[in-house]
Amino acid sequence: MVCCFGKKDERTKTIEKELHKERKIMRRQINLLLLGSGESGKSTFVKQMHIIHGAGEFTADEVRAYRQQIYQNAISAMRVLLDARNKLGIAWEDPKRQVEVEKVMRFTVGDLLKGIDFTTFVEVAPIISDFWNDAAIRKTYEQRNLFQISDSCQYFFEHIPRIAMPDFYPTNRDILFCRKATRGISEHIFEINKIPFRFIDVGGQRSQRQKWFQCFTDITSILFMVASNEYDQVILEDRRTNRVVESRSVFETIVNNRSFSNVSIILFMNKNDLLQEKVPKSDIRQYFTDFTGDHTLVRDVQFFLVDKFEASRRDRARPFFYHFTTAVDTENIRRVFRDVRESILEQNLKTLMMQ
């Protein structure tokens, strides 16, 4: 009997030791929740963390999956442009192209979801390339704020000859531009300077936001992503609500939630590269009548948008952090996250000292 109790005691000690070790790790772990509307750049940010603080490269299986997704991105985006060209009544530069339209439009949503293999893609790649070089598609693309299309489509259209090669192997940059809507919740842990950082990425579409509340426990910081270039676009769900207005509404709900009174919330005004392209072409005053700055200056537009989000906070004494980011730019994210990491660790230390 004594011997039996001795074995149980040893097992108990081992379990307690493991639990103590686990609790110690959990106390050190930084839990970051990525929030924001759909297509704001959350998943791209996680990919950057993988490149900067993870393995640096993606596995062969991951690359193969991304290759199929890139094929899907290119076909799907051209389908959108062809449909929009027709609805906008823009005539083909070369009328002969019309006979090729069905070869791209024949792909159903089901086909695209199942995946596109190389053999299928290579059949339509030259057609997609020809369409992209037609002035009608370029004119349609210039009016893309009127319909829903991925920001990354131009990148893939310009790389069609390379993507259509039999030995095409997506680079990290290709993968950063690759788009796939996040469904549900995904978690990624990276050890940075011996401290585990856990990133929780959840879908940003309205239908996915009910899942956000499952992630609200033990959060150290919230990184809230906004696609700053979308000031002249509407959301997919109702095709009426301005995307920046929608993002601000969501941010207001989060930043004023009592559950996050001790959680630092950092605003990422993302897609700064696309904002700089858009400002000279799209007058923000047409969408925000309260804009009083110089509508041709990127800086004025940037700070107008930041002020919109900053004004939604009720607790004015609470620190407000924001950064202008370009999620597909690895060096930009490396630099920004280095600064963000320091402020998060400092805030976490203060919180631990108060416990």
From Swiss-Prot:
This is Guanine nucleotide-binding protein alpha-12 subunit. Residues 28-355 form the G-alpha domain. Belongs to the G-alpha family. It comes from Caenorhabditis briggsae. One of its GO terms (biological process) is Rho protein signal transduction. GTP binds at residues 36-43, 176-182, 201-205, 270-273, 327. The lineage of its organism: Eukaryota, Metazoa, Ecdysozoa, Nematoda, Chromadorea. Residues 31-44 are annotated as: G1 motif. Mg(2+) binds at residues 43, 182.
